[in-house]
Design a protein with these regions (language model features):
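Glycine- and acidic-residue-biased ligand/ion/polar-headgroup-sensing regions
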Residues: 71-74, 81-101
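Bacterial N-terminal signal peptides
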Residues: 9-19
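Short beta-strand His + acidic residue motifs that chelate non-heme Fe in jelly-roll/DSBH
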Residues: 76-78, 96-97, 118, 123-129
């Protein structure tokens, strides 16, 4: 082993030990974070999709951020929200359609890396087809969803 190689062979473990011994704690009043192990996922028993609230409470007024994993074959039916909602597709392909007629074949693929906005009161539907899709959702709560009932369906009731 060369002299330089010997130096680095001894220096690297020492540097690693020093870095773990000098771990810096972040002030939670300045920087908030959740490590992957700290993110609590829950399963929606109705749809089977998984959600994890990252920030805020989407059922209350104020900002929120939620992770949502759509499972293959799950699609919402036409609905709308009272507030704008913002999305970033993190993995998989999320399929999005608009209008009051549910037609999964008329959806458009949104691959990972795509940013999407659902404008307030815009009727849409979305979900996953053959692979899971994980998206980050954020907006101003309360985040409610109202099923869309087409005018012709309301007249029949």
């Amino acid at each position: 082993m060369t002299r330089m190689g010997s130096f680095f062979a001894g220096a690297i473990p020492a540097l690693l030990m020093m870095s773990s011994a000098c771990a810096i704690e972040l002030d939670p009043k300045i920087v908030g974070f959740k490590l992957p192990a700290d993110i609590k996922w829950t399963e929606n028993t109705r749809s089977g999709n998984r959600t994890a609230v990252l920030q805020g409470d989407p059922t209350k007024p104020g900002p929120y951020a939620v992770l949502l994993t759509w499972l293959p074959g799950n699609m919402s039916r036409p609905h709308f929200h009272p507030n704008d909602r913002f999305f970033m597709v993190l993995s998989g392909t999320w399929w999005v359609g608009n209008g009051g007629k549910f037609d999964p074949e008329a959806t458009v693929p949104m691959p990972a890396g795509t940013h999407v906005i659902h404008w307030a009161k815009g009727v849409h539907y979305d979900g996953a087809k053959t692979e899971p899709a994980t998206i980050l959702v954020w907006g101003e709560g309360p985040a409610t969803s109202t099923p869309f009932v087409a005018a012709e369906n309301m007249e029949k009731k």
